[in-house]
Amino acid sequence: MCASRYRAAQAALALPERFYSLLMTSPQVLDPTRPISDRPIDRLVAEFLAAEFDADPPGATVLGVPGYDERLPELSDPAVNARHVIDEKRLRAFEALPDDELTGQERIDRDLVISELRGRAMMRNWAAHRRDPAAYVAAGLNGVFTLFLHRLRPDAELAAAATHRLAEVPRVLAEARANLDPGLASPLLVRRALAQARAGVMYCREEVPRLVPHPEGRSALGAAAVAAADAYARFSDYLADFEQRASGEFAIGEQRYTALLKRKEGLAYGAGELRERGHAALADLTAQLRHRTMALAGHDDWRGYVAELDSDAPPTPEDMLAGYRTWTKRARSFAYDRGLVSEPPGDRCDVVPAEEFQRAVLAVAFYYGPPPFAAGPGPGHFFVPFPPAGATPAQIRERLATNARSTLATVSVHEAYPGHHWHLAWMAARTGRPVRKVLWSSYFVEGWALYVEEMMREQGFFAADPKAELRQVDMRQFRAARIVVDTSLHLGEMTVDDAVTFMSTQASLTPDVARSEVARYCAWPTQAASYLTGALEIARMRDEWLGAGRGTLRDFHDTIAGLGGLPIGLAEQALRSSG
């Protein structure tokens, strides 16, 4: 999962995905709030980005944009409605830009903003800010986390900024109480946010004061962290009561789902056809798993064999971390030495444990990219899913089994090389259009990471370890199951329990991980379907590129990844008009 420039705050863990902060005294590579030219589209883009950063200051911090580090977002109902009005006005302005007055690159920028604003418009009457507490809980936690992720400012300045943000936590949680409607809120999503709020109490009390190694600023930061922890504790009590009254639904329905696929992502099919594509892919990949299991184990009980492989898990979270570091290094060498992709300048990916507040809601590895607007290439961060504090021995064993030794190679490819880390580092180095460093589609970004898993298998990366190769197919099959479940949940064709059963019987997930996964699908409609859908679309574009003799495999990878993380339909248009 690319949680990253990266807009997961909109998911249930709410990992920010779009913005960031920069050391004010360092040389600024690019101020995205200033037009890159006097052309009308560049002025519109700069105004649009300034409004985006103003609406999501922690997102600005992630991206490396200076001037937003002391603030949290305004999430009151009037503020949300005011942004809706601004979005509609900007949508009309971008739609009014005619093709014949724009260059090819400008048309891509225009259409990228239009796709984003249309997606928001399609979900406006869903009133997510009245349904899901996650964004309110995540605002303060991610607000602090993003400040210290890349440490782009001196510790004393970061401590002061974090103190300001923590002081705003009670205000944000008060906005949640005013906005949340028990008739609209789903109990499942409330429970998910409650788990994060409780983790936030511990994060603020125990982790935040240790973020600053020097005494200067630590006292004020510690006091603000305790006050924020108290606010999260009170909000946890509120959510525990609110859950009992919540009676809303999480399913967005076929009309919204299809509109997002077609009008936002530029796909040619809607929710029903996507579900059937998922079923077909699931059947094909399950057959492959049976065949590979027969070759390795002499029987075709692939789920039983995968369970055996899961028993060969790292004995401790620290061993899991070491394994991910080893495979990340191997994947990097393979991708560069084989000439599959070009190396970005200053490339570095740090493999580190997940933060405590994230562990309660994410059981899988995830990634944050280097801030694209900061001075000089910084490291990306590949976060390893350590179990949360207080996890029972059984829960720790299950978390480790989900990260069995046979899975580490595929996950390292997906999250690091040449998956999320390489893509986002390459895009940051190659993309000169500011808006493409900010807006992206999960169908491309996650599609890319799954595409390269298969591409690396085709190139022989897993050949020396048939068990790891089987797990690559297993993890791809899991993404096919996601398509079936995500569409079925939001079309009202599956209950949550049905979905958990499906994922823990048709895919290889354990019941605990399956339940966590399904809760994520409920909170983030269409995202779970993006992985395999995007991967198949990118593979189709690759085959067309190579078939037309347009260049080498590396040329294709460098070209399409360098365009950004465009919606699939727009990526295809841009690829056809490139070079």
Where do the protein language model's features map onto the residues?
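N-terminal amphipathic/basic-hydrophobic helices that include classical n-h-c signal peptides
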Residues: 1-25
